[in-house]
A protein has these predicted regions:
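Histidine-acidic metal/acid-base catalytic patches
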Residues: 2-21, 27-123
């Protein structure tokens, strides 16, 4: 969870060590409300791993951005308010079976890029 990661980073005691926050893993592994969880560690976040989550909490289902239930607009607003300009990466893991083919991967990347552009990001 963000609180645990913040505790670890604080124990290191270096401004060069930051949290790489993974939005969907916080739900899948941490069973937390991602908005509250990110808020708990925002001041120590240095990188954001954007990954959406669909299906049940422990179901391996990570679709294109905007196709799951991670509240990205709320997270983006929190980051803006905190003046946290950490870089992002996008991860799309699909389901446990993986993508059907390269066309599905390409479409998921396009959908994710479109989603970010719709929310004001320049790619």
């Amino acid at each position: 969870t963000g609180a645990i990661l913040k505790e670890i980073v604080n124990l290191v005691g270096s401004d060069r060590v930051r949290i790489n926050y993974d939005t969907a893993n916080a739900i899948f592994y941490g069973d937390v409300d991602v908005v509250q969880d990110l808020g708990a560690c925002m001041d120590r976040v240095g990188y954001i791993h954007l990954k959406d989550k669909a299906g049940g909490r422990k179901e391996w289902d990570f679709p294109a951005l905007g196709k799951g239930y991670v509240p990205f607009p709320e997270l983006f607003a929190m980051l803006d308010k905190a003046e946290n300009h950490s870089p992002f990466s996008i991860e799309i893991e699909f389901t446990a079976a993986g993508p059907k083919d390269l066309a599905e991967v390409n479409q998921a990347v396009l959908d994710s890029a479109r989603y970010l552009k719709e929310h004001g990001f320049v790619l």
